[in-house]
Amino acid sequence: MLQKTSHFMRQANLINGEWVQADSGQTIDVNNPATGLKIGTVPKAGKAETRRAIEAAGEAFKSWRKTTALERSKLLRKLHDAMMDNQDVLAELLTIEQGKSLFESKGEIGSAAAYILWFAEEGRRTYGDIVPSPWGDRRILVTKEPVGVIAAITPWNFPSSMLARKLGPALAAGCTAVVKPATQTPYSGLAWGALAEEVGFPKGVVNILTGAAGEIGDEICANPLVSKITFTGSTEVGKLLIQKSSVTVKKVSMELGGNAPFIVFDDADIDRAVTGAITAKYRNSGQTCVCTNRFLVQAGVYDKFVERLAAASNALKVGSGLEEGVQQGPLIDEKAVEKVEELIADATSKGGKVVVGGKRHALGGSFFQPTVIADATPKMRFMKEEIFGPVAPVFKFETEEQAIALANDTEFGLACYFYTGDLGRAFRVMEGLKYGMVGVNEGLITTPEAPFGGVKESGLGKEGGHQGIEDYLDTKYVCIGGLGL
């Protein structure tokens, strides 16, 4: 590991401007998924440490909320610049703890920085309103104010960019934050604390702690000082957080599970569709909430698409993310590999055909072969369950109506993709799909300028776009009377 990378690898929690260990002295091991070897530890904090972090954020909020939008924007721009200045070392740290390729890690750091820059600008545009009054002697104002202390819980698959989507709008709006990164990838989260310190954020504005998820989550949900929870993760955990936080009626933003369909119509550009499919399926080894879970291909091009997708999948280079040219790293852990194996076994027992892959990779550990399964049917678990691995099941359909029905046959509604050369069909299908995000002839659609988020059981709220900062603001109505007008 590079010396500078070690500077950002903080094996302590940041609470009120101090780097501290857990009260109990207990730690959690952090392993490199590519090697299985321990790379360090982080504190195993609990309720008491979480409470102190929340109190520190609450105290810091008193002054932070009074800073101007311009002052906050300047600090966020410095944070953006610091991230880009250290892009290579932050990417290396991310790859070491998460496993994805350095190419993807650099892209994630760049994306995270882009979100910070976007919200540095959006924070200056949280406009209020002057409403025409129905009374001649009164005036009506509508203002926007920061909600207060927010708690952000982030996942292991994109440990830097997911935090950027939450910290960026929160800090821009004038909120303070308590952050809990995933225990599998804590260093990318803790690195934000080091960066925030270095660019001059006041103590207590950003607090980051690792530890027992249940204890930290319970304190966040129950503590009345926390005004909002923002979470990216499983639908199961999201529902639990909503339920527990309802006692104190907190605002919540939830970016939860997905079951993304990728539809290919007969009139599609097949080469373009395959290129998009590789991106939409295999980014981060299939471990993304918006990655394709089900390929739905029209009968007329089914065989051609399967053949080309299989060839492209088989050509992907698998290996340690630190190696040059690697496109597929390991899965996050053994449990993830076992889940993929279960889903493949279920598919083959129900008539599915493994075209390429289907097994653990010769590299061992949690490496898995990019896999394409033909003759997939709705009876297979793929239809309802999120794979979170490098497996591409391909279903066949006959009509446009059937494709839309199959795509919508899920409780999830995060992202979806489809390829067609017919403009009229593009609008019909786009309007018929019950998803928060739709890629038309594109397999990679995420950008800070657009609102990211789902419908149905895929979540609540939006991250990115001008909508992204609204969840961190309260709207206040002010009626001014006695003006003697």
Regions found by a protein language model. Give the residues of each.
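Hydrophobic face of amphipathic alpha-helices that form TPR/SEL1-like repeat modules
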Residues: M1-A34
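Conserved C-terminal structural/oligomerization subdomain of aldehyde/semialdehyde dehydrogenase
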Residues: T35-T41, V226, I263, K317-V318, ...
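Residue-level signal for inorganic ion chemistry
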Residues: G36, R72, L94, I116, ...
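Short, well-ordered beta-strand elements within core beta-sheets of diverse protein domains
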Residues: K38-A45, E59-K66, A152, F262-F265, ...
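Glycine-rich loop-to-alpha-helix module at the N-terminal edge of alpha/beta enzyme cores
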Residues: I39-T126, D137
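Rossmann-like NAD(P) dinucleotide-binding subdomain of oxidoreductase/dehydrogenase enzymes
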Residues: M84, G128-R272, F397
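A short hydrophobic/small-residue beta-strand
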Residues: T176-V178, V354, M437
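ALDH superfamily catalytic-core signature
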Residues: E236-T377, V440
